[in-house]
């Protein structure tokens, strides 16, 4: 069980929900991509009362030092009220940090109002070696149309 909060473009933080599942928005997958260990296994290890401190310490990589790079994902929600197809922006798919996406073609043309700050139609995944480039890349996705 964990709370989820969302930060808007103007820096305001809003409560989203209390979720009864592992942390959302692919956080564990992003951690695994950056550090190369399974965060789901780690969560079971740290909650197991029989785990020793040595086992826990030996499982985790060293923070920052052992990272292979920077992993990020962007939650896509259409910027238009009416869409007919998925069209991946050239700026996204040709960027060297682009890895994959989970977006699918729209099933209806009218885009409903967002029901929550975390509502998205799918995720786009990135991985690279420069945190500033990653930050700027993720921010730039806000201005692109994935659904037209």
Model-assigned labels for residue ranges:
Residues 76-107:
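Glycine-rich active-site loop/lid that clamps phosphate-bearing ligands
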Residues 103-148:
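Generic C-terminus detector
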């Amino acid at each position: 069980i964990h709370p989820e909060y969302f930060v808007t473009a103007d820096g305001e933080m809003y409560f989203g929900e209390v979720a009864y599942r592992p942390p959302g928005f692919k956080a564990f997958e992003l951690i695994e991509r950056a550090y190369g260990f399974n965060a789901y296994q780690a969560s079971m290890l740290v909650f197991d009362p029989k785990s020793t401190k040595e086992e826990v310490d030996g499982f985790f990589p060293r923070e920052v030092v052992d990272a292979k790079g920077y992993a990020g994902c962007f939650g896509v929600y259409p910027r238009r009220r009416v869409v007919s197809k998925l069209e991946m922006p050239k700026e996204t798919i040709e960027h060297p940090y682009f890895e994959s996406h989970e977006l699918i073609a729209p099933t209806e043309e009218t885009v409903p109002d967002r029901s929550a700050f975390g509502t998205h139609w799918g995720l786009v995944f990135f991985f690279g070696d420069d945190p500033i480039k990653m930050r700027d890349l993720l921010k730039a996705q806000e201005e692109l149309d994935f659904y037209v």
